[in-house]
Curated annotation (Swiss-Prot):
Residues 90-101, 133-144, 165-175, 189-215, 240-251 have a biased composition (Polar residues). The gene is SEC24C. It comes from the Eukaryota. It comes from Homo sapiens (Human). Residues 8-19, 123-132 have a biased composition (Pro residues). This is Protein transport protein Sec24C.
Length: 1094
């Protein structure tokens, strides 16, 4: 049966499912359960997968017609100059035509000379039919590269002017800290009415394979290859990768008058014969083919010589490589949105690469888990370990088990098998899924993971149809969907006892610092109303979660808020060395029953400690107290800790100030990321055993040792929020918004996750915020919809190309109502014997997510320099393997990138320049530790915008336009001093105002008459009744709604001292900390590749 031919039956189970009203939505999936029935799952909304009789039953491969056409002599071989994804559009986002620019001479291993290559003229191609040879020759004659001034391009191309050089940032940041104390914008409190917080999971289209000079179905022309010789008398000897800043030191300039001369390389042939050893491959994604790679060749820019000695003086200075002639992230993102943002992504085809995370798309579940739950670095896995080692592409999956879905998508269905529980394989314990193969008339099933034959219980038996599929397959979510939930039996519960509903305990620092800043009063006022919005399940009128309160400085104060009391009672525990809970009855209470007593307590706390002079605090005993309270109540739960200073009081977990910037760039730098004492890891282990998750809100005025304090939240599945130099007037909205969201979001407690794989691969490494007591089980005291677990796989046997590879993620957790559940996600991947299929089906955003987490964990045990070198080497090996095995023969002067990895260099450079791996002088040790633990559990969407921020021009699109303005590349070159730009990276939000912006725009946005009157550092825009003001404020609200944390606004004026902070996020430019520009890093990467190939 063809996968695209089946007609779905009528949905038999379209009834509403249990749902959860939490933060912004009433279920894990984000759909509003109170007003509308559950949306039928994907199998009923489109073609059903045609399960065939050969295993795996669930996902069949697509028919040959859906694959890419096999390579032929009429096609451009991989690596050949052809059209790419550079569409005709805004010039500031990259070339729209195949413009050739110069680059630095190719590198030489050990400085050996390189023979000059032949002449290769540039090609300028517009859209349209393929040009004739005569047309090409005409276009070539109109452009020259090596002269000082290039003539205008021919009329058939785009008429953009000569390239400008990349500007490098200079100056210094203000002392306020990168992630701390900028003024805060105002935003309304979160409410249920706001709906789902605008998760935009954008998509990516797979570009089509195309013949030489033939435009594909979509996308713009591709860059031609470019080659060039070394400068006379110059060798390309650069620093080894082991030097501290790969290309981070400022490049040495050539002597005045140096000129790049020599002929350009030969034009690649229009049609190249199939190279030996490279077999024609069908596209492994069984969708649109992911076409040939882009070529970027030619001489490197002359400025970055990477430490080589200047050659003899030459006449004119050379032009540097045009930034517009290299791959543009913005263009790739826009192309994917245009090509894949209009149609739903149907998960019925095995190994299908999903749209990019930057594309907004809908998902129809037809047997594989949605990419919102699982994204892989590659959807086509090498069949052998030798092939995987050769390619060096990490095989990993980023799993977000409780991901929130947009309202248009249904939450996973809940399946109840009663006392018998979910059906599993007897040998490997995998759960029933669409890939299981039923045999012997339905009386047995063969496990798709371990091939064990299992009996089908009588109560689960059903007959098979003529294709070998059960006739009730579409009545059962576990037989037709990629994601679903089982209600767990008592066998899945601790001590064979069903759990109690969880509890929230608020633990408030009442030392001098917390009182002085107004934090305690602000928090107590907010909690009065916030307790009405605790997460609840289904149609429940009130939350089942109980609450408790503790305040502390050097000692701890517990509060009895039993509903029968007229006033709350305080009990003080001063023996912090041996912590215990002084009361059980009345500590954890139902909010509605004890509302009057709780309100009275929250009114009294700020007054009781108003005159305190106690500056010392404890930390470990506070968490111990919360954990003991949960243990006494026999329930799981979450601690909300509000803490202001380094815990220096005499108590377990006492810390000293060890901040030492002199350790940066030394072998001891790793100690700055390690906890000071083992007491915190021991405490975290105890918390996980109890199901006690910790969320930490920090309000430091100075060093607090985030690396140590964040250990417990990190290992328990919690979160850390940091508000440096907290001031109520500037930071209240950000803190309250984060707090509301954190309290309201749905959480799974006391969770255990296991990832099973089919024979041939296994999970070997895990990254994220969790604890592992063995090598297979990920233990999480708490897991919310923002957290991910990244899993790396390795081969332990040969894979079969026909049967593919399977993953199953099973999460056992306790819901907010105390119900024990199993959430299952399944994914089928293709397997390949050709490297070209691997490179054609990679996902660069997921690859960068994995590489960043790998590096950020590496700094705990290795010098930062070694970690950075490892990343550079791995990237070079990935691209060199592609060049050697998949690209058509071409000059060594060409840089050839795989089509779906052409953004790998720019994104990897952003990771290398990040504050954790290459800090500027203004980045504090706490900031680095904070960002390190944040990235560890980020999903692919978050790492994408964190490492490559979005830069949006505000005055170029019509004021009446309701769509988001098109982004521009993150470089100072792209800024116009007559415009205003918004920049966001998921944590920070800047509004940059050009010095020449029109007076009317200034008046409309800031209600002042001139640029000079704008207040730099402003954190709230005035609310003005005009279209531009409404549009900008609406856009800011929209961006904030898309992110998991509130982004505070900072207004930055051009040439103001705050501008250096803004320029830190223009990641295509050189950084103040010595990080390379995108252009320079691409040149350096080319040098590394050539060294590997030679």
């Amino acid at each position: 049966m063809n996968v695209n031919q089946s007609v779905p039956p009528v949905p038999p189970f379209g009834q509403p499912q249990p749902i959860y009203p939490g933060y912004h939505q009433s279920s894990y999936g984000g759909q509003s359960g109170s007003t509308a029935p559950a949306i039928p799952y994907g199998a009923y909304n489109g073609p059903v997968p045609g399960y065939q009789q050969t295993p795996p039953q669930g996902m069949s491969r697509a028919p040959p017609s859906s694959g890419a056409p096999p390579a032929s002599t009429a096609q451009a071989p991989c690596g050949q100059a052809a059209y790419g994804q550079f569409g005709q559009g805004d010039v500031q986002n990259g070339p729209s035509s195949t413009v050739q620019m110069q680059r630095l001479p190719g590198s030489q291993p050990f400085g050996s000379p390189l023979a000059p290559v032949g002449n290769q003229p540039p090609v300028l191609q517009p859209y349209g039919p393929p040009p004739t040879s005569a047309q090409v020759a005409t276009q070539l004659s109109g452009m020259q590269i090596s002269g000082a001034v290039a003539p205008a391009p021919p009329s058939s191309g785009l008429g953009f002017g000569p390239p400008t050089s990349l500007a490098s940032a200079s100056g210094s940041f203000p002392n306020s800290g990168l992630y701390g104390s900028y003024p805060q914008g105002q935003a309304p409190p979160l409410s249920q009415a706001q709906g789902h917080p605008g998760i935009q999971t954008p998509q990516r289209s797979a570009p089509s394979q195309a013949s030489s000079f033939t435009p594909p179905a979509s996308g713009g022309p591709r860059l031609p290859s470019m080659t060039g010789p070394l400068l006379p008398g110059q060798s390309f000897g650069g620093p080894s990768v082991s030097q501290p800043n790969h290309v981070s030191s400022p490049p040495q300039a050539l002597p005045p008058g140096t000129q790049m001369t020599g002929p350009l390389g030969p034009l690649p042939p229009m049609h190249s014969p199939q190279q030996p050893g490279y077999q024609p491959q069908q596209n492994g994604s069984f969708g649109p083919a992911r076409g040939p790679q882009s070529n970027y060749g030619g001489p490197y820019p002359a400025a970055p010589t990477f430490g080589s000695q200047p050659g003899p003086p030459q006449p004119l200075p050379p032009k540097r490589l045009d930034p517009d002639a290299i791959p543009s992230p913005i263009q790739v993102i826009e192309d994917d949105r245009n090509n894949r943002g209009t149609e739903p992504f149907v998960t019925g085809v095995r190994g299908q690469v999903p749209p990019l995370v930057t594309t907004n798309f809908l998902v129809k579940d037809q047997g594989n888990a949605s990419p919102r739950y699982i994204r892989c670095t590659s959807y086509n896995i090498p069949c052998t370990s030798d092939m995987a080692k050769q390619a060096q592409v990490p095989l990993a999956a980023v799993i977000k088990p409780l991901a929130r879905l947009p309202p248009e998508e249904a939450s996973p269905y809940v399946v109840d098998h009663g006392e018998s529980g979910p059906l599993r394989c007897n040998r490997c314990k995998a759960y029933m899924c669409p890939f299981m193969q039923f045999i012997e008339g339905g009386r047995r099933f063969q496990c798709c993971f371990c091939s064990c034959i299992n009996d089908v219980p009588p109560q689960y038996f059903q007959h098979l149809d003529h294709t070998g599929k059960r006739v009730d397959a579409y009545d059962r979510p576990e037989l037709s969907l990629g994601s679903y939930e089982f209600l767990a039996t008592v066998d899945y519960c601790k001590n064979n006892k069903f759990p109690s509903p969880p509890a929230f305990i608020f633990m408030i620092d009442v030392s001098y610092n917390a009182i002085r800043t107004g934090l305690v009063r602000l928090l107590c006022e907010e909690l009065k109303s916030l307790l009405d919005f605790l997460p609840r399940e289904g149609g429940a009128e009130e939350s089942a979660i109980r609450v408790g309160f503790v305040t502390y400085n050097k000692v701890l104060h517990f509060y009895n808020v039993k509903s029968s009391l007229a006033q709350p009672q305080m009990m003080v525990v001063s023996d912090v060395a041996d912590m215990f809970v002084p009361l059980l009855d009345g500590f954890l209470v139902n909010v509605n029953e004890s509302r009057a007593v709780i309100t009275s307590l929250l009114d009294q706390i700020p007054e009781m400690f108003a005159d305190t002079r106690e500056t010392e605090t404890v930390f470990v005993p506070v968490i111990q107290a919360g954990m003991e309270a949960l243990k006494a109540a026999e329930c799981a739960g979450k601690l909300f800790l509000f803490h202001t200073s380094l815990p220096i009081a005499e108590a377990p977990g006492k810390l000293k100030n060890r901040d030492d910037r002199k350790l940066i760039n030394t072998d001891k730098e790793k100690t700055l990321f390690q906890p000071q004492t083992g007491a915190y890891q021991t405490l975290a282990k105890e918390c996980v055993a109890q199901g006690c998750c910790v969320d930490l809100f920090l309000f430091p005025n100075q060093y607090v040792d985030v690396a140590t304090l964040s250990v417990v939240p990190q290992l328990t599945g919690g979160s850390v929020y940091k508000y440096a130099s907290f001031q109520v007037e500037n930071d209240q909205e950000r803190f309250l918004s984060d707090l509301r969201r954190d309290v309201q979001k749905v959480v799974g407690f006391d969770a255990v996750m296991r990832v099973r794989t089919s024979t041939g691969i296994r999970a070997v490494d895990f990254f994220g915020a969790f604890y592992m007591s063995n090598t297979t089980d990920v233990e999480l005291a708490g897991l919310d919809g923002d957290k991910t677990v990244t899993v790396e796989f390795k081969h332990d046997d040969r894979l079969n190309e026909e049967s593919g590879a399977l993953l199953q993620c099973a999460l056992l957790y306790t819901s907010c109502a105390g119900q024990r559940r199993l959430r299952i996600h399944n994914l089928a991947l293709n397997c390949c014997t050709q490297l070209a299929d691997l490179y054609r089906n990679c996902e660069t955003d997921t690859l960068i997510n994995y590489m960043a987490k790998f590096a950020y964990r590496g700094v705990l045990n290795s010098p930062v320099k070694a970690v950075r070198d490892t990343l550079i080497t791995q990237c070079a090996q990935i691209l060199a393997c592609y060049r050697k095995n998949c690209a058509s023969p071409s000059s060594a002067g060409q840089l050839i990138l795989p089509e779906c990895m052409k953004l790998l260099p720019v994104y990897l450079n952003c990771v290398l320049k990040s504050d954790v791996l290459q800090p500027g002088a203004e980045v504090t040790t706490d900031d680095r530790a904070y960002v390190r633990q944040l990235v560890t559990s980020m999903d692919v969407t978050e790492t994408n915008v964190f490492f490559y921020p979005r830069l949006l021009p505000l005055t170029k699109s019509p004021v009446e336009s309701t769509t988001e303005p098109p982004a521009v590349r993150a470089s100072e070159e792209r800024l116009s001093n007559g415009d205003i730009y918004l920049l966001e990276n998921g944590l920070n939000l800047f509004l940059w105002v050009g010095a020449s912006v029109q007076q009317g725009v200034v008046q409309s946005l800031f209600s002042v008459s001139s640029f000079s009157q704008i207040t730099s550092g402003l954190s709230v825009l005035p609310v003005l009744d005009n279209p531009l003001s409404k549009k900008v404020r609406g856009l800011i609200d929209s961006l904030r709604a898309q992110r998991s944390r509130y982004m505070k606004l900072t207004v930055v004026k051009q040439e103001d001292k705050m501008e250096m902070l803004f320029k830190h996020f223009l990641v295509e430019d050189k950084s103040l900390s010595g990080g390379a520009s995108y252009v320079d890093f691409l040149c350096h990467m080319h040098k590394e590749i050539r060294q590997l190939l030679s």
